[in-house]
């Protein structure tokens, strides 16, 4: 993707300096400041407002700097004006996330679940799990709505950063600078900022281009991380020395130089500045070599590397007086920032830009493991055991054959739609964390049981791109394991401590099995249902699990005023959309790599597109004959499937399915709006989920 042709002068102004460097950094690096800094400030302020609304008070400063400029304004001067607000929102969130999270946030994008579900590990000070998910969902949804292709790059980078930093040992020791720099590049999130910059410029790099520029950009990342250490050291050192601090080490190059060379902090700072200068010069040289060599004709990469270079002086300039590193400036900075936001457009039009001096600064300027504290493999019954008083030397049978199939299906990758759906409903219903965990475990347990049984009943050899459970363990063991897991799900419902929840469970399980019985009957008897019959089957079978978790959550909701909001129409629509979407994607190339090429045709199932085609095509059509043959022979070959697909397209059945999905999506969004008005609460988590499911 080539960036939209905006010149640097369209987006930013050069900032004059009295010397070629800024406090000994970024020699001969020009500095620019974005013309639309008011939008950057608005984006950050919106994030802070959302944080206070959904989570609670904010204790630390973020991106703002009324003297040298907002972080995004000076670090990303080439950013498109229409994208700087959302990027600043992301920066602000990242700063606040860094403030409160010790290892990994209690909720963040799940690395294993295709960006749909949200993890829950550990918070340090964040009050609201749901609130964090709300902010993340709103942020991701905005990125995806602006530029879905570039947004996916940002999301992947965020996931990689979170997954990597979670695994980083913050207490580790470093023996040399190179080892520390490799650690710090990831720890500071420099690659993530890089992808946000590309998003802002509408630049998309191919994997080959990423590999080509990797050695060029590394010294830039290193310079950014070390400069961050230099300017943040004073406040980190002060916190480190507090009596209540339990830290044994600091993740800061200044501190490491003090330890390595037994020097005081001023000498250590000087040495950090010196090695930072080396990386700055190395980046300039590598860019020059690339532009004069193999990148001579690659204008996209030249622009990208030039823009990346502006991060170095921008980061230094912002660090000079940002209240984040100089907390005594917070009060004055807040007053100036409020005033500047009111007058920002006038300031931009008049070209008012403060000069940065090289002088010193003054203050003026397992399947169910998460559901219970009890052992996952022991009974939770409080009744006396029949085993009590038995001989102690009796042979004890293990659970490996009982749980093996269940643990296998649970180990396969999942998109986590149901877990994300629970997170979304909890925005409105606000259940205690322990009940949310139990309901998620119930949903996962039931879903895994249904997958094991469905694959046997449908004769499916694959599940999520891997061998189906029964092809490994055999049908008998798989059925036995699935039956046990269903009982385990009922046992988990008891942990909700509400007899009505058990009634709800039985009601919806009954609906689910009734729906499944019709699906199996139609396939076995070669009886094509009407569209109305099929949709009712979906409502009971696929919608049953969605409806079960919704009803359980409403029963346990802490906000009594929201216990009676009309969620059932929305939940039924979600179930219907999810199944028809699955039918559609099973017949598209995108889905075939996971579940097998058009596997529904092998199974002879009457999916939504086939039902529509049956209404239009004659009784003796190739589709009916081929489906009958597939049921008898155990499947169709590729050419037969391609013929069926061709007929489905020719008959307009695929187009009709797409139209139906669009209509359902419109109804879902309308229902979301209605529930938001009824509850008085926006649901960004659900909006993001719906956006990710949209075909």
From Swiss-Prot:
Residues involved in Mg(2+) 4 binding: 454, 458
Binding site for dimethylallyl diphosphate: 463, 541-542, 579, 586, 595, 605
Cofactor: Mg(2+)
Motif mapping: DDXXD 2: 454-458
Catalysed reaction equations from the record: isopentenyl diphosphate + (2E,6E)-farnesyl diphosphate = (2E,6E,10E)-geranylgeranyl diphosphate + diphosphate; (2E,6E,10E)-geranylgeranyl diphosphate = variediene + diphosphate
Stated family: In the N-terminal section; belongs to the terpene synthase family. In the C-terminal section; belongs to the FPP/GGPP synthase family.
The name this protein goes by in its record: Variediene synthase
């Amino acid at each position: 993707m080539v960036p939209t042709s905006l010149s640097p002068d369209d987006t930013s102004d050069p900032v004059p300096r009295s010397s070629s460097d800024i406090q000994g950094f970024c020699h001969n690096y020009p500095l620019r400041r974005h013309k639309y800094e008011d939008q950057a400030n608005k984006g950050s302020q919106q994030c802070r407002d959302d944080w206070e609304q959904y989570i609670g008070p904010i204790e630390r400063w973020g991106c703002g700097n009324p003297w040298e400029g907002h972080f995004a304004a000076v670090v990303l001067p080439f950013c498109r004006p229409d994208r700087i607000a959302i990027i600043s929102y992301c920066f602000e969130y990242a700063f606040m996330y860094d403030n409160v999270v010790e290892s990994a946030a209690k909720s963040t994008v799940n690395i294993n679940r295709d960006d749909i579900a949200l993890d829950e590990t550990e918070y340090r000070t964040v009050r609201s799990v749901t609130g964090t998910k709300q902010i993340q969902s709103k942020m991701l949804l905005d990125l995806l709505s602006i530029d879905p292709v570039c947004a996916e790059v940002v999301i992947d980078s965020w996931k990689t950063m979170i997954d990597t930093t979670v695994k980083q040992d913050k207490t580790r020791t470093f023996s040399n600078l190179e080892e520390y720099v490799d650690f710090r590049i990831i720890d500071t999130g420099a690659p993530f900022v890089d992808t946000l910059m590309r998003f802002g410029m509408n630049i998309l790099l191919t994997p080959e281009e990423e590999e080509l520029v990797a050695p060029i950009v590394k010294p830039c990342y290193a310079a950014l991380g070390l400069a961050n250490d230099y300017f943040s050291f004073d406040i980190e050192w002060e916190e480190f020395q507090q009596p209540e601090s339990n830290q044994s080490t600091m993740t800061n190059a200044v501190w490491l130089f003090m330890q390595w060379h037994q020097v005081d902090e001023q000498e250590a700072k000087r040495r950090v500045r010196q090695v930072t200068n080396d990386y700055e010069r190395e980046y300039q040289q590598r860019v020059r070599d690339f532009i004069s060599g193999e990148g001579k004709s690659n204008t996209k990469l030249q622009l990208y590397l030039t823009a990346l270079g502006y991060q170095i002086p921008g980061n230094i300039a912002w660090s000079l007086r940002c209240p984040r590193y100089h907390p005594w400036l917070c009060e004055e900075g807040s007053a100036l920032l409020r005033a500047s936001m009111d007058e920002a457009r006038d300031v931009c039009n008049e070209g008012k830009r403060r000069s940065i001096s090289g002088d010193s600064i003054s203050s003026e300027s397992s399947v169910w493991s998460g559901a219970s504290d009890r052992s996952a493999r022991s009974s939770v019954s409080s009744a006396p055991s029949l085993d009590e008083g038995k001989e102690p030397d009796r042979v004890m049978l293990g659970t490996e054959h009982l749980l093996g199939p269940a643990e296998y299906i649970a180990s396969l990758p999942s998109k986590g739609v149901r877990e994300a759906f629970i997170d979304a409903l909890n925005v409105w219903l606000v259940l205690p964390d322990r009940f949310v965990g139990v309901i998620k475990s119930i949903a996962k347990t039931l879903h895994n049981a249904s997958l094991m049984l469905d694959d046997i009943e449908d004769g499916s050899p694959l599940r999520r791109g891997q061998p189906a459970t029964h092809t490994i363990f055999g049908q008998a063991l798989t059925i036995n394991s699935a039956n046990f897991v269903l009982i385990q799900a009922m046992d988990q419902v008891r942990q909700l401590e509400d007899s009505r929840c058990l009634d709800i469970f039985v009601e919806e399980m009954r609906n689910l099995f009734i729906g499944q019985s019709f699906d199996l009957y139609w396939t076995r008897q070669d009886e094509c249902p009407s569209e109305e019959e099929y949709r009712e089957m979906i409502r009971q079978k696929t919608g049953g699990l969605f409806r079960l978790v919704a009803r359980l959550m409403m029963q346990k909701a802490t906000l009594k005023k929201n216990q009676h909001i009309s969620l059932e129409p929305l939940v039924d629509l979600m179930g219907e959309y999810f199944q028809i979407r699955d039918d559609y994607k099973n017949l598209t190339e995108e889905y075939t790599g996971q579940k097998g090429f058009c596997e529904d045709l092998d199974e002879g199932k009457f999916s939504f597109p086939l039902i529509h085609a049956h209404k239009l095509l004659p009784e003796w059509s190739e589709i009916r004959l081929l489906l009958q043959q597939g049921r008898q022979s155990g499947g169709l070959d590729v050419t037969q499937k391609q013929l069926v697909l061709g007929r489905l397209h020719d008959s307009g059945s695929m187009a009709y399915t797409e139209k139906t999905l669009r209509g359902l999506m419109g109804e879902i969004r309308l229902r979301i709006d209605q529930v938001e008005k009824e509850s008085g609460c926006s649901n960004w988590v659900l909006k993001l989920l719906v956006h990710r499911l949209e075909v």
